[in-house]
C-alpha cells in the first residue's frame, strides 16, 4: 500500500501526509491504510479549492488557465495540510477578519464567498452514516459538511453542494480512479474495511432492496425519497415548531422556550437545619476490626468459631458504660444487650462443643431493642368498614437536614488504599468466551488498582453481612440469632486474615413480601470518640467497652475502644441487592472501559496497556470548590468504584429522584458547553423537582454540593 500511495499521489501531498502522521505519533509503515486515507483526503481538499476564484465584482468564477490580467482572489482558504499551530493561526485570523464563529475542531477549508468553514469527508462507507458521524462530532451549524464516497455518492449540509457539478464530477472521477487502481493491486478490500476496523457498516447494513423500498414507502407525506427527507431533517429548525405544538395542547400550557445561557442556571438550594446523620447499615471509616492471621483453629470458616477466636485476641475489655446516649431510646437496654452478648459468648466457650449458631435468650432488653410486640395489630379492612373516623396514621414530615463535612470525609476515605487485598481476580468472573486477552488484561489491570481500596472492603463486608442476615432470617424466623460481622482478606505478604467488626442480633423475621422488614440490633467496634461529631451518631447509643494498645512511631499508646449500638431494619429486597454489591466492581470497570474505548478509537489501536501504565498522565476525577480535581488512572478507578459503592450503601428514594432530575439539568448544561444553544421551558419547575429530593440524606446532599461545584466551573 505504501508503494502505491507514493506512486499514485503528488509528492507534496505524500510529504504533508507523512508530517500529519508523525505529528499524531502514528507509524505509516504499520498504518498504511490510514496513510492512503490522509493522502486521499488532502487531494480532495486541494481539488475542491483548485480553479475557484472570486473576481473584482465579488462573484465566484472558475478559471482553469492563468490570466495574468485578472485580479482574482482564491475563493477557498486551505486549512487542511498545515501543522496544527499554523492551522489554528489561520482559523483565528479568518474569524477576526470575517466575524465568523470560531469552530471547536479544525475545519478543512474556508469559503470566502459563502463566509463559512467547510469540513470535507471522504468515506469508504455509506455517505449518510459518515455524514451523521461528522455532524455529531462537530455539533455546529456554522461549519458546512460535504461528504464524498468512492462510489460516486455525495452528501452536504442542507443539500447545498457549494461547487458546480463539473468540479464535483472531477473529484468523484479521481476517487473512482483511486478505487480502481487499489482494486487492481488487491488493496481495495483491506482499505475499505479499515475505516471501521473490520467489516464495515456498508457491508452489513447497506440499505438496499426491500429495506430501501420500505424506507421510501414509510416517509412522511410530500417526500419522494429518503435523501430528500434526510436533507429536510438536517436543515430543520426545531424551536418554533415545538412551541407551536405545545401551545395546541391546552389553554393553560404556555411554554415559551427561553434560551439557556451561561448566566441562566442558579445553584441548587441545599436545605438548612441540623447536620445530617450517619444512616448506613454498618460503620464505614469508623469501623474497627479484631483480626486473626493465618486462621487454622478448629471450625475455621464457621462464623461463630471465627468470631470467638477474634474476640480472644483482645485483652483490654472493661466494664462497659454509656458515653453517648441515644436521645429517644432506653439506653440501659443497649448496655444490657451488650453485656448479654458477652455473657452468652462466655457460656458457649464453657461448653464442650461450640455450636454452629447461637440464638440469644429473649430478654426484655432484646425484646425492646428488636421491637418485639411493638407492631400495631393488623385488622382486616372488611371488619372496620363501618368505623366512621377510619384514617391512615398521621406521619410527620421528615425534618430537613443540612450537609455535614463527615460524609465528604467518608467518601475520601472510601477512595483510599488499605494494606490488605479484599478481592481475588475471580471476583469479577472468569472469561466465558475467548473474547480475547484484551478483556482479561483490562480486568487484571482494574483489579490491581481497586483490590486494596477501602470501597472494596465495604463491598465484601456488605456482601457478607447481607448474606448472613438473609440466611438467618429464612432459617431461624422466630429466633434472636447472633450473627458475627466478618470479612476476609489477605495481608501484603499474602497471608489470610479473618476480621470481626462486631455483631448483629436479628429479630423475628417472617418475611413474606420483598418489602417486609426484619429488625436487627448492630453492635460495632470503633476507636472513634462519638463526642467529636455527636450529630453524626444521632441514631446510635455508644458505649466505652475497653482500652486498646496501639503501636505507633513513638511507642505504645492506649486508646479507648467504643461499641456503636443501634436498632436498624432491612428487607428481603434490600438484602438481595446487598448480597450483589460486587456488581459495583463491574459498573465501575465498564465506566473505565468506555474511557479506554474512547482513547482507543482516537488512536485507532487498543490503548489498554498505555492507559494503565502511563503513570505520568492525569485524568479528571470530579469537581470540588477548588475546581476540577485530577488524579492517576488508579485514583479514577477507585473514585468511580467508591461512587458506585456509596450509591448502593445509601440507596434511597431521595437518591433515585435526585439522580433522575439532576441528570436533565446536567444534559442542558452539557449542551451549552458543546455550543448547541439549548432552550428550556419551566426551568424553575425542574429546580423544584431536584430540590424536592434534598431532605436529609447525607449522600444526596453531598452529590448536590458536587453538582453546584460543577455548575460553577462548567459555566465560567
Curated annotation (Swiss-Prot):
Give the EC class as a word.
hydrolase
Q: Which InterPro entries does this chain map to?
A: INFV_PA, PA/PA-X, PA/PA-X_sf
The coenzyme or cofactor needed here is: Mn(2+)
> Cellular location of this protein?
Host cytoplasm; Host nucleus
Q: List the disulfide bonds.
A: none
Q: Where is this motif: Nuclear localization signal 2 (NLS2)?
A: 184-247
Ordered alphabetically, the record's keywords are: Cap snatching, Endonuclease, Eukaryotic host gene expression shutoff by virus, Eukaryotic host transcription shutoff by virus, Host cytoplasm, Host gene expression shutoff by virus, Host nucleus, Host-virus interaction, Hydrolase, Inhibition of host RNA polymerase II by virus, Manganese, Metal-binding, Nuclease, Phosphoprotein
- PTM (free text): Phosphorylated on serines and threonines by host kinases, including human casein kinase II.
Top-level taxon of the source organism: Viruses
Locate the residues binding Mn(2+) 1: 41, 108, 119-120
Q: Locate the residues binding Mn(2+) 2.
A: 80, 108
Query: What GO cellular-component annotations does this UniProt entry give?
Result: host cell cytoplasm; host cell nucleus
Where does the motif Nuclear localization signal 1 (NLS1) lie?
124-139
Q: How is the cofactor bound?
A: Binds 2 manganese ions per subunit.
Q: Name one GO biological process term.
A: symbiont-mediated suppression of host mRNA transcription via inhibition of RNA polymerase II activity
A Pfam family this chain is assigned to: Flu_PA
GO terms for MF: endonuclease activity; metal ion binding; RNA binding
The keyword rRNA-binding belongs to this UniProt entry's keyword annotation: no
Question: Which HAMAP family does the entry link to?
Answer: INFV_PA (MF_04063)
- Record's family? Belongs to the influenza viruses PA family.
Quaternary state and interactors? Influenza RNA polymerase is composed of three subunits: PB1, PB2 and PA. Interacts (via C-terminus) with PB1 (via N-terminus).
Q: What does this protein do?
A: Plays an essential role in viral RNA transcription and replication by forming the heterotrimeric polymerase complex together with PB1 and PB2 subunits. The complex transcribes viral mRNAs by using a unique mechanism called cap-snatching. It consists in the hijacking and cleavage of host capped pre-mRNAs. These short capped RNAs are then used as primers for viral mRNAs. The PB2 subunit is responsible for the binding of the 5' cap of cellular pre-mRNAs which are subsequently cleaved after 10-13 nucleotides by the PA subunit that carries the endonuclease activity.
This protein's name: Polymerase acidic protein
Q: Organism source for this protein?
A: Influenza A virus (strain A/Northern Territory/60/1968 H3N2) (Influenza A virus (strain NT60))
Q: Which gene encodes it?
A: PA
